[in-house]
Amino acid sequence: MSKYLNNTLSKISADKLTSHTPSAPAPSHLPDSMISSVSLLPENKRLILFTRHSLRERSDGNGFASYQLPLTPKGRILAKSWGRWLSGHLPYSLDVDSISSPIGRCIDTAQLMQEGAGLRRDITHQSLLVEPGSLVTEPEIANPVFKEIGVLNFINRFLQGNLEGTKNTYQGGLDILSLFYQNQPQHGHLMLAVSHDTLLSAFLAVMFDVVEIDWNDWPKMMEGVFLWFDDKPFDQASAHFIWRGQVYTRPISSLLDGYRAAGYHPSKLLLPPEVQWN
């Protein structure tokens, strides 16, 4: 997805960021992209790690993972090791409450990452982080399609606006951004937001403004995007994010403009209460 850049999405050069190149080896089974992303983190931001859960049991042939599928023993070790690694190698404190999909493997990932960091903080269950719940308005229509056509086809049809019972594409991204904006930690802190591959892939596609992705774009287990906002009102801020070793900036106003141009009413968006959008 990183090859798709337009006028509303820009890269930030590495020399504008403070490099954190850790010397300690990464935890086993952690996607390589996470360490290359860590090396580009800025200092003293209100940082969020929007991540897929850790290693779980195998799904069916369509990529559909039952809500009951747990983390594997290796997945539990990875989540705990990753939390310990982040706590020991970043100039950020993880001592902040987490948010998570209410599905067990996501909650367990957040809890184990906290435990690895030597913490025991609250984990708030967020329905917006459930797959494919954040994208769906009529589950009785969309959910059977999700199971029938598989996750990749479902996300691509969502991105193309060709899927009944789902939100407008921009709304799907804006609602998640609004959730993160309203749950930002204090400066110098890192908040965990644990979710699923479908939500993370759809969110990134919206941020990159693409209408089709493939399996190469698909987030691996325990792979995530680091994200922070400008210290401005939501509709005036830009979202900055690091994905697979590249830093990008997307003005939130461009997403709002896209949503409005599609003819949708702002009352459907889950915007922060202080946003007055006419």
Residue positions per predicted region:
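Acidic, low-complexity terminal tails and accessory targeting/binding regions
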Residues: S2-N44, V130-A142, Q186-H189, S201-N278
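Active-site-proximal alpha-helix that buttresses catalytic centers in soluble enzyme cores
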Residues: S2-I123, T166, D214-D230, H240
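Phosphate-handling substructures
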Residues: E57-R58, A65, L69-P73, Q111-L177
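Glycine-rich phosphate-binding loop signature in dinucleotide/nucleotide-binding domains
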Residues: L90-S93, Y181-G188
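Residue-level preference for the first positions of well-ordered beta-strands
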Residues: L47-I48, G188-V194
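A Trp-anchored, charged/polar loop motif used as the substrate-binding/catalytic surface
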Residues: L30-M34, Q171-N183
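A broadly tuned preference for mixed-charge, low-complexity surface segments
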Residues: S98-T109, G150-N162, Q236-G263
